[in-house]
């Protein structure tokens, strides 16, 4: 009679366990790296969306700009490291048929976070609670592209320095009808010259 061995030897079982263990460790490492990469890419996407949303809201604010002198600043637009100007907006919770309302918006940088504060009373001094728009901002500057002589510029340039994207620059054209309208001070000066 032939004595046939049934099953595996101890050496074969140990070799199979070692191979299975190595494959399990490799699979875990691959899964862990894929999960880490996914989390990192989601964070990058979220930060980019936050930047894009901030620029879109600033663009909308500037496109809806109203040439109205603010009583607290006595200017139509305050530009620089803080920006204050009047814009028109519709309350998203109000019915669509409701007219747009005037708002004073205030963009400013505090503790590496860019904020947007809104005053629903355009000549009021008290902002509603500011909304954090963009984090990890090193500098924020809005500047006029029409020189210092003109109170209402034709366009403004945003200079934004972020930790993630470095220096960003974006030019925003102001509404064309504002460029054609003269401010009251310019109209008075023009009338005085004709007399």
UniProtKB/Swiss-Prot annotation:
N-methylphenylalanine PTM sites in chain numbering: 8
InterPro entries: N_methyl_site (IPR012902), Pilin-like (IPR045584), T2SS_protein-GspJ (IPR010055), T2SS_protein_J (IPR051621)
Propeptide: 1-7
Superkingdom as given in the UniProt entry: Bacteria
Induction: Silenced by the DNA-binding protein H-NS under standard growth conditions.
Keyword Hydrolase on entry: no
Name of the protein this chain belongs to: Type II secretion system protein J
Organism the protein comes from: Escherichia coli (strain K12)
Gene, per the UniProt record: gspJ
